[in-house]
């Protein structure tokens, strides 16, 4: 487990010296371009029980996000609101131990599924962890969610990526049911199942729907993306370009890309 000094919002535990350098660069680009870091809410309650012993520091992930994102959404836009809500949800699921303290979701009604797989209620989703939820529809030889612990699932990907930022690409409908496309990316500098990365950029593209209540809390989330190819890239069985062939071959049309991803994602 990471101690409070090295509790990061990324996969790489950082020394104080490393964190100081990252923060210095982060502040520099914020001043230079007038950019703001993502807003992850609900992190300041002194009674929060943090999973790793302390409040996470997202400086590394935020730095990578600002430098490598493909979209800059205007302040107050629906895209930015959705982006920050999802980032808050990810933070709470990854770092707040008790599901009852997660304020980005409605604790009584929240449910989530990925690629047409099992629908998880709030408490169970928190117990098994985001990765087991989002990879649940994969065959067991790709990802065995039934026999992978919360800790094991997070270690697998945090050992592969120093940071893995996420961004909203486009939003196609407003509340209460928000439909959106997204991008998740990172440089494979670590190791996954004994396969060493070479620093290659690994990108995930997908789409999702999120239902929110009048408090802008998530009540239902459905996510679709090509999970199997992602794992095969980390195993060295495919190249990163293979994972994005459908998305990029459609000439940038999100609906054609989504249809191509959906045809692979849903079980037959």
What are these regions (language model features)?
Residues 1-268:
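C-terminal and inter-domain tail/linker signature
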